[in-house]
Amino acid sequence: MKTTIILILLTHWVYSQNPTSGNNTATLCLGHHAVANGTLVKTITDDQIEVTNATELVQSISIGKICNNPYRVLDGRNCTLIDAMLGYPHCDVFQYENWDLFIERSSTFSNCYPYDIPDYASLRSIVASSGTLEFTAEGFTWTGVTQNGRSGACKRGSADSFFSRLNWLTKSGNSYPTLNVTMPNNNNFDKLYIWGIHHPSSNNEQTKLYIQESGRVTVSTKRSQQTIIPNIGSRPGIRGQSGRISIYWTIVKPGDILMVNSNGNLVAPRGYFKMRTGKSSVMRSDAPIDTCVSECITPNGSIPNDKPFQNVNKVTYGKCPKYIKQNTLKLATGMRNVPEKQIRGIFGAIAGFIENGWEGMVDGWYGFRYQNSEGTGQAGDLKSTQAAIDQINGKLNRVIERTNEKFHQIEKEFSEVEGRIQDLEKYVEDTKIDLWSYNAELLVALENQHTIDLTDAEMNKLFEKTRRQLRENAEDMGGGCFKIYHKCDNACIGSIRNGTYDHYIYRDEALNNRFQIRGVELKSGYKDWILWISFAISCFLICVVLLGFIMWACQKGNIRCNICI
């Protein structure tokens, strides 16, 4: 009975031991912010690591409309850019228009004489980058021919008409003399001339319009020469026409001369388009144009450019994020997340950063929890928090600066005869996208690794700073906590936090308390041993009592035990 009482008292004494319960000591733990549910990011060393906060770097959706600010966006409606340039009857509204971005719709249609442009993509790109359809008529002299040819396939209102920027020349009477016309460029800018050649559907149509059985058109400058011969023959009818017109273009530099020579089939220029160098462009899109502000436009609509990457569309205009294949890339903007444990062992003591993070910290990423004679408390450390935030805040802006394109990514178009070039261009573009996608993932992983290492380092700096302040007045308990061997009220804790703690003031008291406490203090390891020993002794005593009861009962005859062999 005495043994049992002693064991009970010993067990109660062990459980009642708490290193921080005395009025002459205190416990100070250092910790960091944590959240219940963090965000997974990728680093160089880990595919998935949880952090307290992260920012998405990939813009994956558009706003569904094209913003008309800060760029001048011109809605082509039913006209392509080339149709507007040639002077289609239903595109007259676009004469002399200016734009930063010309939007071509899928609803475009043709209502004039059927034509083709052998180098359509190049002409479209040149006109688009010029950003204007500013046209100047010139006094070409076409002697001995009939000008202003018209076609029933090209109606302006109810009347037969033709492309307003071109002059269709046919015979005059029974003659079509050889034409030789020159036009110098005395200006200080490039001139773009549009001209063409008519391909009749039959020999009869050829002689009916031009007298000669076969015409010829030669257009030359000091730098170039083009000679085109008509291809006479029937073709599938378009708007009642089996003939075709091929459109060509010539750029005349300042000081150069345009020379036109023809003996038939000439579709002559009426003047020139003034060439300008700029970053205007053209884009095919059916997204509506609205009043809003966005510096990046895609065929899907405008997108914000506050992220370094996007996977909305390869084709962009303006200051846009870099296109990559990934749907998501997250940049760590917080520290490694270690959710707080709700139960921290048998004694319920406060814990430091080695064990877990602290949820609910609102005044900093790093901080202190303490337990002293005045109770318990928590406070953030603003200096270490600000040091980490300052280094992290610039990461997103630096990534955006490295990746945002300050130019437009134009659409690539090639004719069928340039199929091999188109395949090569596609291969190059796909390779660039693959390379950028890899670089983006690597860049983000490196930045995330740096962020986590940085925040861990700031925690360690704060711990070392606190340890150097306390010196021999405290003992490192492990887990990010210190046992302070002197009375340390809230003012004392505050001096440790703000770096004004003077360990000399408390040195004698701490040394005295350390020697007194160590004489009777049982470490947690010894407590565990005592608990196990007491448990074993209790089990042994129970067995002894049970065996003694059985032997007593057998002697009294209350229990009979038969052993058979």
Swiss-Prot record:
Disulphide bridges, residue numbers: C29-C481, C67-C292, C79-C91, C112-C154, C296-C320, C488-C492
Processing after translation: Palmitoylated.
GO terms classed as biological process: clathrin-dependent endocytosis of virus by host cell; fusion of virus membrane with host endosome membrane; fusion of virus membrane with host plasma membrane; viral budding from plasma membrane; virion attachment to host cell
Site feature: Cleavage: R344, G345
Residues modified by glycosylation: N23, N37, N53, N78, N180, N300, N498
Lipidation (S-palmitoyl cysteine): C554, C561, C564
Gene Ontology annotations for the cellular component aspect, listed alphabetically: host cell plasma membrane; membrane; viral envelope; virion membrane
Transmembrane segments: 530-550
GO molecular function, one term: host cell surface receptor binding
Topological category with respect to the lipid bilayer: Single-pass type I membrane protein
Keyword Membrane: yes
UniProt topological domain (Extracellular) ranges: 17-529
Localization per record: Virion membrane; Host apical cell membrane
Subunit structure, as described in the record: Homotrimer of disulfide-linked HA1-HA2.
Protein name: Hemagglutinin
